[in-house]
Amino acid sequence: MNRLPSSASALACSAHALNLIEKRTLDHEEMKALNREVIEYFKEHVNPGFLEYRKSVTAGGDYGAVEWQAGSLNTLVDTQGQEFIDCLGGFGIFNVGHRNPVVVSAVQNQLAKQPLHSQELLDPLRAMLAKTLAALTPGKLKYSFFCNSGTESVEAALKLAKAYQSPRGKFTFIATSGAFHGKSLGALSATAKSTFRKPFMPLLPGFRHVPFGNIEAMRTALNECKKTGDDVAAVILEPIQGEGGVILPPPGYLTAVRKLCDEFGALMILDEVQTGMGRTGKMFACEHENVQPDILCLAKALGGGVMPIGATIATEEVFSVLFDNPFLHTTTFGGNPLACAAALATINVLLEQNLPAQAEQKGDMLLDGFRQLAREYPDLVQEARGKGMLMAIEFVDNEIGYNFASEMFRQRVLVAGTLNNAKTIRIEPPLTLTIEQCELVIKAARKALAAMRVSVEEA
């Protein structure tokens, strides 16, 4: 039987939500009621599948804690008042911390003037952010298209490459095994996880995947495509595969790919949605090898953990295919004033506080600690790896990784797995994490592993 719409119910629910937004604290009964409501509404109106994925990190094995507010730059507080060191970072969006005051202030000030643009008049913050990114990014990257997410930035990059290369008879894209570029149709065609791809087959034609980090496989693919007339329009890859399990390529790999792209006339698209904005110890991970892409994709941390924003930055030669008709690829909310204000403030904080260098320093400290734990617990930990504040601990099997996340939750540290590698727990904290908090995270990991070893021995 069809359910009839109810304005009264919608009004009551929205009013209840607005009341919660205004609250700063909850009493015990309000907390319990909110937890029940959130679980019920996820089950009935969001997606019940999410509940199972959020289950069992708590001591009682029930559904995950309900998030309430940021505690400090580097912590979260749940509805029960428990504070957690955030080593997940919203999958890499909180590079400048939670509710960074500079970013929040910029957004609040812009909100007081105008939240969204008219679409007809020229919006100044979009122009200023594009100029800022042209100055910040490497090489000849000059023009920016703004959107709302990482997958949108990849979609724009693929369409831009198509528009540029189609007149040249080049239509093929090469991506890499283990890659994650998003889940919209074009980005999913470049993503290499069968779980995400199979339900939506057939995807876009013309995509091939080669092993990540294997430069000879890349050369072979480019050669074969040329021989068969399937000339390559672009190679798309992540400098470090984030969702693939924080997989680092061999030194010199990006440089070699750049040379191959030049040799075969293919564009180089670098997806720095997760590695960009200081995460790996440089503003952009490609700077570790001084590699200059033709198209660069950004998102996640670009909005400072306050507003969603993505960007696709390209050279003038490539981007000029949109000059005659700038409406070939647009989005209503892309480059809106609130998002641009957040991005400009985020860049300012990253540069003023030299957070990329801090990411390198504190990342080295954390990674040294995790590698020591790997030596102490070889029966549980296979490897610790990473660069800057993008790290991973890989366990000997999937279940151990899951148990580690649960034990870390008990130690009040939030971590999570990666989408393409279930054995791997990602460590991706804010770049603002303090030295003391780094020490606490290592201490918590040691306690978690010790508890897990006891459980294994008792079993």
Curated annotation (Swiss-Prot):
Q: Which Pfam families match?
A: Aminotran_3
Which EC numbers does the record give?
2.6.1.82, 2.6.1.29
Quote the biotech use from the record. Answer: Can be used in the industrial production of the value-added compound 5-aminovalerate.
Give start-end ranges for the coiled-coil region(s): none
**SUPFAM superfamilies attached here?**
PLP-dependent transferases
Q: What happens when the gene is disrupted?
A: Cells lacking this gene show a high decrease in putrescine aminotransferase activity, but are still able to grow with putrescine as the sole nitrogen source. However, a mutant lacking both patA and either puuA, puuB or puuC cannot grow with putrescine as the sole nitrogen source.
Q: Which reaction does it catalyse?
A: an alkane-alpha,omega-diamine + 2-oxoglutarate = an omega-aminoaldehyde + L-glutamate; putrescine + 2-oxoglutarate = 1-pyrroline + L-glutamate + H2O; cadaverine + 2-oxoglutarate = 5-aminopentanal + L-glutamate
Keyword Transferase among record annotations: yes
GO BP, sorted A to Z:
L-lysine catabolic process; putrescine catabolic process
Q: Which UniProt keywords apply?
A: Aminotransferase, Pyridoxal phosphate, Transferase
N6-(pyridoxal phosphate)lysine-modified residues are 300
How is activity affected by pH? Answer: Optimum pH is 7.2. Optimum pH is 9.0. Active at alkaline pH.
Cofactor(s) demanded: pyridoxal 5'-phosphate
Question: Any stretches that span the bilayer, and where are they?
Answer: none
Give the residue range of the signal peptide. Answer: none
Q: What induces it?
A: Up-regulated under nitrogen starvation conditions. Expression is sigma-54-dependent. Up-regulated by putrescine; this gene expression regulation is controlled by at least two sigma factors: rpoS under excess nitrogen conditions and rpoN under nitrogen-starvation conditions.
Q: Which InterPro entries does the record associate with it?
A: Aminotrans_3, Aminotrans_3_PPA_site, Class-III_PLP-dep_AT, Putrescine_aminotransferase, PyrdxlP-dep_Trfase, PyrdxlP-dep_Trfase_major, PyrdxlP-dep_Trfase_small
What's the family? Belongs to the class-III pyridoxal-phosphate-dependent aminotransferase family. Putrescine aminotransferase subfamily.
The protein in question is named Putrescine aminotransferase
What is the taxonomic lineage of the source species? Answer: Bacteria, Pseudomonadati, Pseudomonadota, Gammaproteobacteria, Enterobacterales
Q: Which gene encodes it?
A: patA
